[in-house]
């Protein structure tokens, strides 16, 4: 298991209170593969640095998790298929 951090930018037309439950359904991919979700932090609605799909605002969420590379790849694939997800970024933070 490796430590990953995933940043997700969602469409600003969603209600902020529904973001965490909707992300939780996608995070079941990690849980069924034996991984664990350590923290889900919803930053809220923020202005984008540049337009994405003609949108200037998005709802940011950061997820810390422990999982296998295959499980994270499947999660990223499923998030990209969702039309309300504007961008995703998966990183492995350096251990200090």
Swiss-Prot record:
InterPro entries: Ribosomal_bS6, Ribosomal_bS6_sf, Ribosomal_S6_plastid/chlpt, Transl_elong_EF1B/ribsomal_bS6
One of the GO biological process terms: translation
Annotated keywords: Ribonucleoprotein, Ribosomal protein, RNA-binding, rRNA-binding
Keyword rRNA-binding: yes
GO annotation, cellular component aspect: cytoplasm; ribonucleoprotein complex; ribosome
GO molecular function: small ribosomal subunit rRNA binding; structural constituent of ribosome
Keyword Transport: no
Family that this chain belongs to: Belongs to the bacterial ribosomal protein bS6 family.
Summary of the function given for this chain in its UniProt record: Binds together with bS18 to 16S ribosomal RNA.
PANTHER family: MITOCHONDRIAL 28S RIBOSOMAL PROTEIN S6, SMALL RIBOSOMAL SUBUNIT PROTEIN BS6M
Protein name: Small ribosomal subunit protein bS6
Source organism per UniProt: Salinispora tropica (strain ATCC BAA-916 / DSM 44818 / JCM 13857 / NBRC 105044 / CNB-440)
Gene name per UniProt: rpsF
């Amino acid at each position: 298991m490796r430590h990953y951090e995933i940043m997700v930018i969602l469409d600003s037309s969603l209600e902020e209170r529904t973001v965490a439950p909707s992300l939780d359904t996608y995070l079941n991919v990690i849980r069924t593969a034996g991984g664990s979700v350590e923290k889900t932090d919803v930053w809220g609605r923020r202005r984008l640095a540049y337009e994405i799909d003609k949108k200037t605002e998005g709802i940011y969420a950061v997820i810390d998790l422990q999982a296998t590379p295959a499980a994270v790849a499947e999660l990223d694939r499923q998030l990209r298929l969702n039309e309300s997800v504007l961008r995703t970024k998966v990183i492995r933070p350096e251990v200090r």
